[in-house]
Amino acid sequence: MSSEFLSELHWEDGFAIPVANQENKILEDQLAKLHKEKSNLQDQLRDYEDRINSMSSHLKNVNQEFLFTQSLYKARECEIESEEHFKAIAERELGRVKDEIQQLEKEMAIILERKNDKENAIFKATQKLDGLKCQMNWDQQALEAWLEESAHKDSDSLTLQKYSQQDNNKIRALTLKLEKLTMECNEKRKLLDNELTETLSAQLELDKAAQDFRKIHVERQELIQQWENTIEQMQRRDQEIDNCALALARIKQEAREKEGVVREKIKFLENEVGNNVEYERRISIAERKVSKCRMEYQRQEANRNQLKDELDTLKTTLNRTSSDLEALRKNISKVKKDILDETGRLQKLKHHNEIVKHKLKMITEKTISIEEKATNMEDMLKEEEKNLKEVEVQLNIVKGVLFKKVQELQSAITKEKALGSEIEGTRSSLKHLNQRLHKLDFETLKQQEIMYSQDFYIQQVERRMSRLKGEINSEEKQALEVKIVELRKTMEERKSTLSLLEEQIKKLHNDLYFIKKSNGKNKDEKESLMNKIGELHLFVDRSEKELNKAKAVKEDLMIEDNLLKLQVKRARELLYSKAEEVLSLEKRKQQLCTAMEERVEEIKVHKAMLTSQIRYVDQQRQTVSSEFHERLSKIDKLKNRYEILTVVMLPPEGEEEKTQSYYVIKAAQEKEELQREGDSLDAKISKAEKEIYALQNTLQVLSSCNNNYKQSFKKVTPSSDEYGIKIQLEEQKRSADEKYRCKQRQIRELQEDIQSMENTFEVIEHLANNAREKLSEKQTLSFQLRKETEEQKPKIQRVTKQCGRLRREIRILRQTNDETLEEQDIQLREIIQFHKDIDQMLVNAMENAEIHVIFQTYFQQNGLELPTAKGPSSRSSSQSSLSSIRSLEDSIPISPPTAKVIELRFPGPPARSDSSRSSSGSNSNIPKGKKLNK
């Protein structure tokens, strides 16, 4: 702080730093105390704020806990209300059951009373019958007297008939009333059974509802218990949070105290640093400090050398890894170049052969006639057709090589990635070491700066002392002399540059000649690059067309996939519906089984009841028949008794005999009574027989129903219609399963096809991206070449104008209009250079083994030697041959050179589609059969 303040005041280093007086020191102490109080108050304020925040959070937690307890209280109230409601329902149920028990007890008492009444009535009737029997047995005299009296009256018979008819009518009415009562009794019994079933079902429903209520009540209690557990956990968490808040406040307080201590220490440190600076400036013995600094410097230098050795070792490892990486990159680039050469060399050869053919046509235009051209064209067409097949074979070979190279490239890329990761690790370690080195260098520089500042300060003091003494420095004189010498040297350098510029002007005139040649080469390269760009455009168009086709195929596959998904969905829905039908049929079967079992049990019960009823009716019939036989025997006994009585009761002599009408009336009365009893018994027997017939009919109906029901559960025979329906359903199910499996297989195959198509699509996209990148690179390169050619055009025009002007001047000086020897020499050199370029192109093309074999066969057919790569010695031989050529030019007349034509056929890329053929034919007129003139 003091150094910055002094630098702002522009305080010189030689003067001492001003120190505060006693009053200012007191003010500084007061200011420090106030700052300390301020920091303490700020700490207290922060402590209070933390407490307020903790209390507000605690209040929030308390409010939340209060809400939870309120909700729990409400839940408990609801539970108590539900318990009271269940208690009231149970009390009502208990009262209802008690009322029903009382009603049943009352009904039982009424039934017992009726039973007692009926028993009393039966007992009274039996007593009456016994009394009647006694009267019939013991009151024979009264009856005979009454018969005697009634025999005299004719009207008694009429009254008897009338009473008998009335009795018959009463009997019929009573029988009808009895039948009606029995019908009503049966109906009431049925209603009673229905009511019993309804009450039982209602009771079951009530039991189920009560069970559901109990289950819900248990679940509610469990939920409340969970709620209480969560509240307890939240309370524990709140307690933990409160403890943590207290601990946090305590830690913050400790941190504030430590910060205060740190501030005091920092202030003390700053004061000490200021004092040290002041004391260091006041130190007079600078040599000790310099020696210390030098020792420190030596130590740091030793450390630096050690770190430098470590850095060198790491650099060697880095260089080794980088060399390995470069080797891998070279291999990768070589593989890429081989791939590009394999794909592009054919087009290059075509382009070079086209240029050669064009130039040879210009040279041999005068010699070759129209007929020879026609024959050559026919031969070219024939050979083109032959070479198309060879091209396809070679293209397949190239594709295989390309696939292998791509695999090698992928493996090399993986290796490159691994090496890249290793290099990044070494680089990170290098960065770390470099940072350490920089730190050490920075420290050494600091030490050196301190040393330099001390030396500079000493020099300044010495200079001031010398200036005060009035001495002149010899160094300034030496500086002026050095400046004079430097100015003389600059003058000599200017002269030498002038001579060099003159020599460079001469060289520029010579360079114009070479620029002309390089311009021609640049034109050729430009044409080749334009052809390559056109080929790349064609490749991009083809790849885009294939991409569009792949997209269309993918869309079709997606549509088919969606259709198959819809079919699968429909089949699944049909399957689910069939499964539901099967489940419903199985449920129906189970229900029928249970119903059948219940029905069988009911039939058994009903059958037992019917058997008991039949047994009871048989017993009644037997009793009636026994009573009938007893009555007949009684009638016989009565007849015998009557005969005995008639004999016994003959009147004594002198008394009147009872009339016959008396006995006839008595017999008629007895007969009528017996007839009534017999009619009543016949009615009972006929009624019992009718009931038996009705029961037999119902039994037959039940047996037929049971038989049908049993037959419905029998196995289906092959001759029945149901068996055919079953077979049809099984076949439909089997066909549906097969269709489902086929659809699943088709879906799996389509998914695999889609996956493969996606993979191929990704590969095509990758190739298209690579092609686009290459195209962009080629476009940038072509743009640069165009720019360079446009820049070279004005130079070429200037050079051609200058050459024409020089040619005219030379011809004017020699006073000739014909070509001079120098011009012919230049043309000859151009032709020789042209042949050399062709030979070099052929040599470069023959680096490929397959193309070398093709060249060798064609050159051997025409009796020519293959061109070889020439060394630098060929240039001197060509220069020596030029002088001999010049000497022969004057003696030998110039005749046009005879050109020997070699037809070369190279395999071209196969046509992918008609559109690509037409586009390639329209864009480039490059023939596939090449001619070379030698």
Curated annotation (Swiss-Prot):
Coiled coil ranges: 17-133, 164-512, 540-615, 664-826
Cell compartment(s), UniProt: Cytoplasm, Cytoskeleton, Cilium axoneme
Modified residues (Phosphoserine): S887, S895
The keyword Coiled coil appears for this protein: yes
Keywords: Cell projection, Cilium, Coiled coil, Cytoplasm, Cytoskeleton, Phosphoprotein
One GO cellular component term noted in the UniProt record for this chain: axoneme
Compositional bias ranges of the Low complexity kind: 873-892, 912-925
Swiss-Prot/TrEMBL GO biological process terms: axonemal dynein complex assembly; brain development; central nervous system myelination; cerebral cortex development; cerebrospinal fluid circulation; cilium movement; cilium-dependent cell motility; determination of digestive tract left/right asymmetry
InterPro entries reported in the protein's UniProt record: CCDC39
PANTHER family reported for this sequence: COILED-COIL DOMAIN-CONTAINING PROTEIN 39 (PTHR18962:SF0)
Name assigned to this protein: Coiled-coil domain-containing protein 39
Organism field: Rattus norvegicus
Top-level taxonomy: Eukaryota, Metazoa, Chordata, Craniata, Vertebrata
Gene: Ccdc39
